[in-house]
Each structure stands twice: as structure tokens, then as C-alpha cells.
């Protein structure tokens, strides 16, 4: 069985590449999709296309709405959503994506350091698995696709 997997969450490390490379190396039948992961492009898309704003709020609002087109589609079309909460920044968008996945009845896997367990207890409670490393996620994907 082939799966569509959406990789959501922090954009400051190469965790997505680790998971995609791990799945490819094992020959897993998975098609991955992601949000826009170039930070500057994601932050500036609204003003780059629709024009400058005097307020940071409206600049961010434009970008968030345009980025949401891809994010919403990615989550809706996924069989599994993988959401990473990184250590450096508070990823409110990752928590929002987890909420969307849960509301849509999507299976999702969360990755975060143990220190975040209390803060993310509600997010974790709805997750099908809570991992701390990309390698653990690859092992989960291997199990669900190969039964090994």
C-alpha cells in the first residue's frame, strides 16, 4: 500500500530530508509533500506578489493566507501527517497544523524533544505516535508499509 505523507513543522533543520532519504533508502512506497520550506520565500510571498504593506501584521497576514493554500491542500491530501516541533523556536504553525490534521481525522506523528512533553500533551494525546528522532519516524513508516 502506498502512502501520501505530508511533512509539517519547523524549517530550521534538515529533518525532512532525513526522513525522505531514509524512506527512499528502504524503498518504501511513500510520496512526500511539504510546505514551502525556504524561510524568506514563505515570509515574503504576500508582499512579493501582492505588494508592500506598512504594517508587519498585514505582511504576515498576506503570507500566511497564501502559504495556507499549499498547507491546507497538503494536509487534506495526506494519509499521514508528520509534524516536527524544533528546539529553537516556538512553532505555533506546527501546533495549528496538528489541530487541522486532528480535525480532519488524519493520522499524525509528532516529533519533539522530551522537554516539550508537558507543553504538547494535548497534541501528543491525539497523535498516533510521538517520536524524538527522524530515525524513529522512518522505522514507523517502514513498519506500516512493509509490516516489518
Spell out what each predicted region is.
Residues 1-148:
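Conserved catalytic or regulatory cores that recognize and/or transform ribose-phosphate-containing ligands
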Amino acid at each position: 500500500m502506498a502512502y501520501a505523507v505530508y511533512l509539517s513543522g519547523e524549517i530550521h533543520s534538515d529533518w525532512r530530508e532525513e526522513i525522505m532519504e531514509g524512506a527512499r533508502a528502504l524503498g518504501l512506497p511513500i510520496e512526500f509533500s511539504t510546505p514551502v520550506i525556504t524561510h524568506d520565500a514563505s515570509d515574503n510571498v504576500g508582499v512579493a506578489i501582492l505588494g508592500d504593506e506598512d504594517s508587519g501584521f498585514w505582511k504576515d497576514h498576506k503570507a500566511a493566507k497564501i502559504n495556507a493554500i499549499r498547507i491546507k491542500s497538503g494536509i487534506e491530501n495526506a494519509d499521514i501527517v508528520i509534524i516536527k516541533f524544533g528546539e529553537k523556536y516556538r512553532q505555533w504553525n506546527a501546533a495549528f497544523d496538528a489541530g487541522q490534521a486532528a480535525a480532519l481525522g488524519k493520522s499524525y506523528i509528532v516529533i519533539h524533544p522530551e522537554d516539550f512533553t508537558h507543553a504538547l500533551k494535548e497534541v501528543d494525546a491525539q497523535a498516533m505516535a510521538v517520536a524524538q528522532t527522524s530515525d524513529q519516524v522512518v522505522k514507523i513508516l517502514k513498519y506500516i508499509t512493509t509490516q516489518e
